[in-house]
Amino acid sequence: MFTSAHANRSPLTSASVRRPSHSVVEHSATGLISEIVYREDQPMMTQLLLLPLLQQLGQQSRWQLWLTPQQKLSKEWVQSSGLPLSKVMQINQMSPCNTLESMIRALRTGNYNVVIGWLTDELTEQEHERLALAAEEGHPMGFIMRPVRNTSQPGRQLSGLKIHSNLYH
């Protein structure tokens, strides 16, 4: 699993984000769009990376939105994963085009601390810019989940992980 070259860009810092309706602590890592490319035959790797973050974000007052193509989150899985059932929303059976537009709208609202969307194709620079601007406006974290394609691309890393975060530096 790896993140894309344009992942983890955040134009905001914790000092520059202040809203009366949410505490600064809730916005310490906001306005972030990351792309997680994963292997479908190894779902545990993705869960090991994302679940601790999602559990921590679940303690905040805002919702978590999952835009899934076909899978439906089970109530049992959400609870056993330590996620707050009362703060997890899911919209499933969306086409990739609708997923991107729905992500942009959801990121802008400020109602969610995280928006997770599954896409099959890489984003264009323009699509990524639209997502980044929406995240800057609404202050959530956005995760684009994309499965690895079997065709190898020359010069591109096919496994590994890069994490860039101003939380740890």
UniProtKB/Swiss-Prot annotation:
The keyword tRNA-binding does not apply. Gene3D superfamilies: P-loop containing nucleotide triphosphate hydrolases. Keywords: Cell cycle, Cell division, DNA damage, Septation, SOS response. SUPFAM superfamilies: P-loop containing nucleoside triphosphate hydrolases. Disulfide bonds: none annotated. GO terms for biological process: division septum assembly; DNA repair; negative regulation of cell division; SOS response. Residues 1-20 are annotated as: Disordered. The record marks 169 as: Essential for degradation by Lon protease. Residues 1-16 have a biased composition (Polar residues). Residues 106-112 are annotated as: FtsZ binding. Is rapidly cleaved and degraded by the Lon protease once DNA damage is repaired. Pfam families: SulA. Interacts with FtsZ. Belongs to the SulA family. Component of the SOS system and an inhibitor of cell division. Accumulation of SulA causes rapid cessation of cell division and the appearance of long, non-septate filaments. In the presence of GTP, binds a polymerization-competent form of FtsZ in a 1:1 ratio, thus inhibiting FtsZ polymerization and therefore preventing it from participating in the assembly of the Z ring. This mechanism prevents the premature segregation of damaged DNA to daughter cells during cell division. This is Cell division inhibitor SulA.
